[in-house]
Amino acid sequence: MTKTVFVLNGPNLNLLGKREPGIYGVATLDDIEASCKREAGQLELQIDFRQSNHEGDLVSWIQEAGEKNAYVLINPAAYSHTSVAIHDAIRSARVTVVEVHLSNIHAREAFRHHSHVSAVAKGVICGFGAEGYLLGLRALAAIAKEEEKNGQSIKGA
């Protein structure tokens, strides 16, 4: 069975490739989407790739993923550090989440060191640039195989 992964991207990620390339790299969000689609095909995953600058959209998409029994690979961007709403959406949707960040949030400003999402994520990948998305997809594919082997759904963190 092919598992769906919602690849959710938070605020300002639509500016990738232009915004602080020394921190976030030169890959655009379109580049990342294309590489995710290629990787997903090899991993027998289906992806639904989305971006919004609005917190409520991310909350609604997390809830939708839960309703569809999909996984979530999320780069919440700045909402990592501020959004209890996204934390609560993940917890209430009981969805399997991998959090990804292009930069190493722990090597940056102190206010970026804490993520509300990490507490409810299955795992966190940060500091590997656009490659982090592919690592996240591989992790979710491994979880899907384990679930299929055991005939179960691994929900939440």
Curated annotation (Swiss-Prot):
Q: Pfam families, from UniProt?
A: DHquinase_II
In terms of InterPro entries, this protein maps to: DHquinase_II, DHquinase_II_CS, DHquinase_II_sf
Coiled-coil ranges per UniProt: none
Q: Catalysed reaction per UniProt? A: 3-dehydroquinate = 3-dehydroshikimate + H2O
**GO MF annotation terms:** 3-dehydroquinate dehydratase activity
The keyword DNA-binding is assigned to this record: no
EC number, UniProt record: 4.2.1.10
Q: Which UniProt keywords apply?
A: Amino-acid biosynthesis, Aromatic amino acid biosynthesis, Lyase
What is one GO biological process annotated to this record?
A: aromatic amino acid family biosynthetic process
Q: Where is the active site?
A: 24, 101
Specify the pathway.
Metabolic intermediate biosynthesis; chorismate biosynthesis; chorismate from D-erythrose 4-phosphate and phosphoenolpyruvate: step 3/7
Annotated site residues (Transition state stabilizer) in this chain: 19
Q: Does the keyword Lyase apply?
A: yes
CDD domains documented for this protein: DHQase_II
Q: Which domain of life is it from?
A: Bacteria
Q: Which residues bind substrate?
A: 75, 81, 88, 102-103, 112
How is the quaternary structure described? Homododecamer.
List the NCBIfam families hit by this protein, alphabetically.
aroQ, PRK05395.1-2, PRK05395.1-3, PRK05395.1-4
Task performed by this protein: Catalyzes a trans-dehydration via an enolate intermediate.
List, alphabetically, the HAMAP family matched.
Answer: AroQ
Q: What's this protein's family per the entry? A: Belongs to the type-II 3-dehydroquinase family.
**Mind telling me what this protein is named?**
3-dehydroquinate dehydratase
Source organism per entry reads Brucella abortus (strain 2308)
Lineage, uppermost ranks: Bacteria, Pseudomonadati, Pseudomonadota, Alphaproteobacteria, Hyphomicrobiales
Name of the gene encoding the protein in the UniProt record:
aroQ
